[in-house]
Amino acid sequence: MKKKQQQHPGGGTDPWPHGAPVGGAPPCLGSCKRRIPLLPFLRFSLRDYGFCMATLLVFCLGSLFYQLSGGPPRFLLDLRQYLGNSTYLDDHGPPPSKVLPFPSQVVYNRVGKCGSRTVVLLLRILSEKHGFNLVTSDIHNKTRLTKNEQMELIKNISTAEQPYLFTRHVHFLNFSRFGGDQPVYINIIRDPVSRFLSNYFFRRFGDWRGEQNHMIRTPSMRQEERYLDINECILENYPECSNPRLFYIIPYFCGQHPRCREPGEWALERAKLNVNENFLLVGILEELEDVLLLLERFLPHYFKGVLSIYKDPEHRKLGNMTVTVRKTVPSPEAVQILYQRMRYEYEFYHYVREQFHLLKRKLGLKSRVSGPPVRPQFFIPTPLETEEPIDDEEQDDEKWLEDIYKR
């Protein structure tokens, strides 16, 4: 019986019913009508390329819109590229030398009792030395502003002669919200309990600048209030030693929104976000020399030579005059209560401290502190009040700085 020949898919019989001969493709019989379809692949590649380019364009436009709508200042973006996103353990050494752009608008919205008078003294010397415009304010006890006050202050700052460095005790201002160019922010904070104790005794007894300094600063304070024992103030829950007065550092970074003055997660997270997006550097007072070193590294047009000035014996002598006098340490029970009431302040402080140390490691600087920070144990926190805070009574009279500088 004859076997049926296999039918070829294109019609007719298949000349190789058992497969094509070994050793290559079969010769073309008759006219070859089958071709390899290259064009569809080419068309697919062009479509894919066009899709990628369109996506890139949308991303670029979105980035531009973000920048115009209040994104981080260009200098901070360049700095992040300079430092990279890897951790120190992923690096093999300090980053290669590179020239960073020069920001011409810097704001130091200094936190009270965090070394600001020392830094202002240094800035006065540096502004004369390097020729930048140091802009200060005669208002020292108004940190929260109305919308109109924000607009007026931003207008005054933005029209200052550049390059400028503006400094004042004021909560974070969003320049972009009012159509201004967002400046680069810098600041310094310290351990919250240490800051509170320094301010508590400074308001009552001043510092080494003069015996009557505190009388000028708080003339209306009654004697019983001036000599109020710190433990009684804390344990008896006096307004000065409880919330919202203790919720002090975070609003400087959270901003002017009313919720920024309410102790809680919302203000804390917003403060962290602003630190990441708008602050070039937030240092800690406990490591002031490293803070000055980083400022000199990032802002040489403002801070070049600041460390040598700070270490100068004459400056040390003047700096010692700003040390608060008559400070006493509260009892352990009182300190633990302060920890409980300042839980959000401590969470923010430790976050800033860790970011500061990470930045130092990326630049190859060894931390001067040994071991990890000891975090306070809050146990069961007491309820945090959210009433309107009392205005900051710290009036930073800077006339003495001018008198010292003229010597």
From Swiss-Prot:
On the Cytoplasmic side, which residues?
Answer: 1-49
Where do glycans attach?
A: N85, N141, N156, N174, N320
Listed EC numbers: 2.8.2.-
Q: Enumerate the Gene3D superfamilies for this protein.
A: P-loop containing nucleotide triphosphate hydrolases
Compositionally biased intervals (Acidic residues): 386-400
The protein's enzyme class:
transferase
GO CC, sorted alphabetically, is: Golgi membrane
The protein's topology relative to the membrane is: Single-pass type II membrane protein
Q: Which UniProt keywords apply?
A: Glycoprotein, Golgi apparatus, Membrane, Signal-anchor, Transferase, Transmembrane, Transmembrane helix
InterPro entries noted in UniProt: Heparan_SO4_2-O-STrfase, P-loop_NTPase, Sulfotransferase
Q: Where is the active site?
A: H169
- Disordered as annotated region, ranges: 1-20, 386-407
One GO term under biological process is: regulation of axonogenesis
Residues on Lumenal side: 71-407
Q: What does the similarity note say? A: Belongs to the sulfotransferase 3 family.
Purpose of the protein: Sulfotransferase that catalyzes the transfer of sulfate to the position 2 of uronyl residues in glycosaminoglycan chains. Has mainly activity toward iduronyl residues in dermatan sulfate, and weaker activity toward glucuronyl residues of chondroitin sulfate. Has no activity toward desulfated N-resulfated heparin.
State the name under which the record lists this protein.
Uronyl 2-sulfotransferase
